[in-house]
Amino acid sequence: MIGMFRTKENSGLKVFLFFFSLITCQFILGQLKNHSFSFFSTPNSNEISHSSIKPFLETYQMLYDTNRKSNVSTWKRKVFDESLLLVLEDQVRLTTDPLFNFLISPKKTTQGYLYSSNVRGFRITGDLTKKLSFETRFFENQFFYPDFLSQKAIERAENENTIDAIAFGIGRAKKFKEDGIDAGLANGYVSFSPAKGIIFQLGHGRHFFGDGYRSLLLSDYVPDYQYLSGQYHFFDGKLLYKHVHAKLYNLSRIPVSTTPEAMLVPKSFGFNQLSFQATPALSFSLFEGTVFKAYNPNSGTSTPHISYYFPLMGSHFLAIDSLSSNSTIYGVNSSYLITKSMKLFTQFAVRSANKIGAQFGIRNEFSIDNRKTISFLNLEYNYVPTAMYAVDSNNQFQQFSHMGHELAHPLGSGFSEWAIKGQINYGRLFCRIGNTFVKIDSPGNNQPFADQVFTSNDLIEAIDKSNLINLNNSIGFLINTATRMEFSIGHLSRSLDGVWDNYLFFSFRTYLKNDYFDQ
């Protein structure tokens, strides 16, 4: 079932985590709901503690106060600042909202369809006392992707004849009409706090590690996955520790099955994060993540290495073996506020002495409307060496991937990238900037473009470098702050070695997740 774990396999783990946290944690007050992933709609990001660990809990998010203007009428608050349905009763808070993304371009596909997105769904959130919160979302999606994305969506599924394509950020998909894609999406979580400063989550969602637009370790680009997490605060909130135990899937099916549609080949994914807020301006964090073997072609599904169940930083060293059966990556992240509005950040990802990725960035927040809204500009440089995440041919089921998506950067490895991202706000009007400039390995051995994560080590051959440019800029109007409902007009332009694709688009959407079409 989506979002659920088999109780038999994990009940002992849950009990251990519960008592472990009760014994070791010092307590501070914590809220329980996650802030939505949206790089362009996180106000005062520079003021958030432990900013490398995402999703943010409401404790650290500077939320928009929908009641700060007492002279605003009820209907205006409902239209512009509140959820469609809002229930407040003692310690209970419930909200319901429609979610959608209606995007259309005047340009047509080769079959005569307009490039478009047709996404419809809903969101329900709830706080039931201070100890229990939940959120659930459901979407139906039809896409007519730009040509470069459509080709990649089909290529990623070509090795499994029961799957037509992938939908980016969603997972497996079916063909829709001649050249469209249809996919469903359901996610959600339940948060429980047995004591102050301790939060457990059981859900179907995603995570992110880092301060930049990109992450070289773990990104929300990947589709939702089943997970169980624990989050603990020490020393008056200066230290934050989080561990996550997840179940991922390869985009290939188990060969022998008694059902018409066999189960996808599984793998287990565990990651530990430790963040230290040394001062209000200085933060350091560590990351340890491993894709554990959970399937053997000869014997079928198997139990992952015991260290998968340990919620302790450093325990994944125990999983390293001579056969590279488990794929481990380590990382460090740091950030420093030069001023209240300007932040420097770095990230390093390490697999071995000759496989080290690096990120350097700067983010500046400012206002052009007397602090009514916050604008920002983000400049970052990302470098990932060739075959950074690749595994050998004997361990293809332990790739750093989930449902045909890279776990970290959408371009995989073998590139250097400059990314310029930002948003200029004036009241509810905005100008959004999203441009990347990349030098990336040109594939050899007839391999697809930017596919190194899914290619075994011995087949990766970088014969030359290609120049990739993605330009995605828009202007628009923010309608509702609770759902980030907006209308925008913009363009998506992509150049690969001087060959351009250009798309004009009109969009009416609720912006609660990142798209990552710049690949």
What is the role of each PLM region?
Residues A183, Q277-A278, L282-Q519:
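Exposed, low-structure sequence patches enriched in small/polar residues
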Residues M1-N34:
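Bacterial Sec-dependent N-terminal signal peptides
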Residues M1-M4, L248-N250, V438-D441:
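Short regulatory "switch" loops immediately downstream of catalytic or recognition motifs
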Residues L32-S283, T290, A294, F360-Y383, ...:
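Outer-membrane beta-barrel channel domains
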